[in-house]
Amino acid sequence: MAKQTPLYDQHLACGARMVDFHGWMMPLHYGSQMDEHHIVRTHAGMFDVSHMTIVDLHGTGCRDFLRYLLANDIAKLTEKGKALYTGMLNASGGVIDDLIVYYLSNDFYRLVVNSATREKDLAWINEHVANYPVDIQVRDDLALIAVQGPDAQAKVESLLNDEQKQTIAGMKPFFGVQAGDLFIATTGYTGEAGYEVALPKEQAADFWQKLLSVGVKPAGLGARDTLRLEAGMNLYGQEMDETISPLVANMGWTIAWKPEDRQFIGREALEKQREEGTEQLVGLVMREKGVLRGGLAVSFTDEMGTLHSGVITSGTFSPTLGFSIALARVPQGIGEQAVVQIRNREMPVQVVKPSFVRAGKPLV
């Protein structure tokens, strides 16, 4: 039986088409995925992301533990509330999960991990925490609502009391702070400004209704996927998994190589990969008719005339751009043009950096 978030009844009341998403009943759309996409790019939309797992770490060993567990270095986090995006890797350098970690105090960190990887994430964390004085608390008592778009922050702020407004005033991107009952973070998965709000699950339905009352529109998994793909953001299980390293998945920037004496899980494997070279993640644009889809083959000829092949990891029609875009894993040496096999046709595609739209503005 698929699980329900605290907002299940609200989704039904909003006319959602519900689907089973990794064991959770979640809204795919509320009538028009395209409209929901555009609302987030131009005004404000909200997503129920309560299926994601919030894990709080308390104790004097948190800092040392997370510096060993994660590829990025939480020692960079010196300002209270600052967040970091990172991979949690296995010994061979594969990505067990990508996650966000918030520094809330020297002995309090908060992780937000993916829903599909919940059980293996918790098992991995518990397996490696044994030697550290750390208490792990899974926050199943919290719901999580992402409000995204150019008007999103103003809409959320209109619902806050004066003390909460003061708490979040001037908060920079990629920070999180506790404001009364709400944990408010300037993070997201759309390429737009916004807030992700964690709150006691018994308050979630009321907060959702208040957001509706100030004109925030609900958006489902369909729009969430096209928005994140336009923004060039990875989806676990497509751009990376336990067999794919961050170096291959355009996550090299999330690996903290220095200090060189910091030992983290997967470091040795990554150093070898960095030396030997890896495949890379690129963006593809197809202005011809048709849609690029995950799993399609990509081919190109390098400067030496050698034919190489790769694969599309995620692809879609871009509602913002009006043509098809994709992320693809390919060998090094690709130029500005490639070919994608769609049914029996070879379609020309342009190779670009793996990011297409940010803050509503086209990058291609």
Curated annotation (Swiss-Prot):
GO terms for molecular function: aminomethyltransferase activity; transaminase activity. It comes from the Bacteria. InterPro entries: GCS_T, GCS_T_bac, GCST_C, GCV_T_N, GcvT/YgfZ/DmdA, GcvT/YgfZ_C, TrmE/GcvT_dom1. GO terms for biological process: glycine decarboxylation via glycine cleavage system. The keyword Chaperone does not apply. It catalyses: N(6)-[(R)-S(8)-aminomethyldihydrolipoyl]-L-lysyl-[protein] + (6S)-5,6,7,8-tetrahydrofolate = N(6)-[(R)-dihydrolipoyl]-L-lysyl-[protein] + (6R)-5,10-methylene-5,6,7,8-tetrahydrofolate + NH4(+). It is an enzyme of class 2 (transferase). GO terms for cellular component: cytosol; glycine cleavage complex. The keyword Transferase applies. Disulfide bonds: none annotated. Pfam families: GCV_T, GCV_T_C. Its EC number is 2.1.2.10. Keywords: Aminotransferase, Transferase. The glycine cleavage system catalyzes the degradation of glycine. The glycine cleavage system is composed of four proteins: P, T, L and H. Belongs to the GcvT family. This is Aminomethyltransferase. It comes from Photorhabdus laumondii subsp. laumondii (strain DSM 15139 / CIP 105565 / TT01).
